[in-house]
């Protein structure tokens, strides 16, 4: 059984309208799974503007860290809107020089994220941005990378949280804000 997409800030009319663009794809990536596709929402100019505004709203930060891949798109837009810089947290093999690397477990395997050298500095307040929070492994690794540079995780913000997967429990010490839940 699936739950409908819910907007957490019901007073945000633009975000409510944007949430209607989230597409449900049954049996993807495997039978029995209901995939929530936010791509149509990000492809719509008004919806994207509402998402970007909501992702950065109410957070005090010096720089944004966007998680590969859609976290790059969202993070860059949030950073531009707030006049800050943006750092891309990358999958392995994409950077010429790596400051830090975090390996983490996924439901079926493992993965890694890397922080580019010369980007984050000690004491910076970092807003971590990603598209979807599922099991929490990736977001937890992103927060570990930020801390490994001596920076502070000011908050983490995602477009969609899949609450049944319990990802929020992997980052209990982080101020986590989701725009939508399902």
Curated annotation (Swiss-Prot):
Classification via Pfam families: Pribosyltran
Gene Ontology MF term list: adenine binding; adenine phosphoribosyltransferase activity; AMP binding
The keyword Ribonucleoprotein belongs to this UniProt entry's keyword annotation: no
Cell compartment(s), UniProt: Cytoplasm
PROSITE patterns xref list: PUR_PYR_PR_TRANSFER (PS00103)
Keywords assigned: Cytoplasm, Glycosyltransferase, Purine salvage, Transferase
Catalysed reactions, semicolon-separated: AMP + diphosphate = 5-phospho-alpha-D-ribose 1-diphosphate + adenine
GO biological process, one term: purine ribonucleoside salvage
Listed CDD domains: PRTases_typeI (cd06223)
Coiled coil location: none
Predominant location: cytoplasm
Pathway(s) of this molecule: Purine metabolism; AMP biosynthesis via salvage pathway; AMP from adenine: step 1/1
EC number annotated for this UniProt entry: 2.4.2.7
Leading EC class: transferase
GO cellular component: cytoplasm
Homology family: Belongs to the purine/pyrimidine phosphoribosyltransferase family.
Subunit structure: Homodimer.
Function (record text): Catalyzes a salvage reaction resulting in the formation of AMP, that is energically less costly than de novo synthesis.
Protein name (Swiss-Prot/TrEMBL): Adenine phosphoribosyltransferase
Organism whose genome encodes this protein: Saccharopolyspora erythraea (strain ATCC 11635 / DSM 40517 / JCM 4748 / NBRC 13426 / NCIMB 8594 / NRRL 2338)
């Amino acid at each position: 059984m699936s739950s409908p997409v819910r907007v957490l800030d019901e007073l945000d009319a633009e975000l409510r309208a944007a949430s209607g663009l989230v597409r449900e794809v049954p049996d993807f990536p495997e039978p029995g799974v209901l995939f929530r596709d936010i791509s149509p929402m990000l492809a719509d100019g008004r919806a994207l503007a509402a998402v970007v505004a909501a992702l950065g709203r109410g957070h005090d930060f010096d720089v944004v860290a966007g998680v590969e891949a859609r976290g790059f798109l969202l993070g860059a837009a949030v950073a531009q809107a707030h006049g800050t810089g943006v750092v891309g947290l990358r999958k392995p093999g994409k950077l010429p020089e790596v400051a830090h690397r975090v390996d983490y477990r996924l439901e079926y395997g493992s993965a890694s994220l890397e922080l580019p050298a010369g980007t984050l500095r000690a004491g910076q307040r970092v807003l971590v941005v990603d598209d979807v929070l599922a099991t929490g492994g990736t977001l937890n690794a992103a927060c570990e990378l930020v801390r490994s540079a001596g920076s502070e995780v000011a908050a983490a913000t995602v477009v969609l949280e899949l609450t049944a997967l319990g990802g929020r429990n992997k980052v209990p010490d982080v101020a986590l804000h989701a725009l939508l839940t399902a």
